[in-house]
Amino acid sequence: MKVGILFSGGKDSALAAILLSPFAQIELATVSFGIVPNDAASVARVLGFPHVIIGLEAALATATVDAMIEDGYPNRGINHLHKTALERAAARYQIVADGTRRDDKAPLLNVREARSLEDRSAIDYVRPLLGYGRRAIDALADAHLEVAYGECISFDYEVELRRVMESSYGSEAVEAVFPQEHIQSRVTGRKSVVF
C-alpha cells in the first residue's frame, strides 16, 4: 500500500510519515509553485523516504494571494490551496495523507470536505495527527526528530505565497495579512529511538 503524504519539510508532515511508515510505503510530495528554491528532497532523504514535487500554476498563487488580500487574513486562501494540493496528490496516489492536526485552523478540511474529496477522487484521505494537540506533537517531535525553528524556513506553500504577495502588494501587505511571529519548523535530522 503506497501513501502520498503532502510534505513541507516540517515536523508535522514528517511525523505523519513516521507514524504511517510501519503500515505503508511512503512517498513524500511537496507542492510548489516553483517560485522559491525548494530543498524538501534533502529533508526527505534525512527521513529515509522518497520524494517528489507536484507543481502548481503561478496563476493559482496569484488568485490565492488576491483572496487573502480581500479577506485581510490567510485562512480561506490557505484552505483553498490545501484542497487543491490534496486534489493534485489524489491524481497520483490512492491514499493521500497530510500533517494536519487537531488544533489547526488552516489548512484543515472539515469532515464533509474530507468525504467529498474521497468520493470525488476515489481515494482515501488519512490524517494521522488529527487527534494530537500541540504539546503531544512537540513531545513526539522532540523524541524522534531534530528540528530547527524560524520564520519561513519550511517548504510549504505559505513561503511562496508570502513572496507573491510581497511582489504584488508590498511587504506591508504581508505583515498585515499573515500572523506576526509565525514560527515554522524544518526537520534537520531523525533521532534513533530505542524502546
Tell where the protein language model's regions lie, with residue ranges.
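Nucleotide-activated chemistry modules centered on ATP-dependent adenylation/adenylyltransferase
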Residues: M1-G4, G9-F195
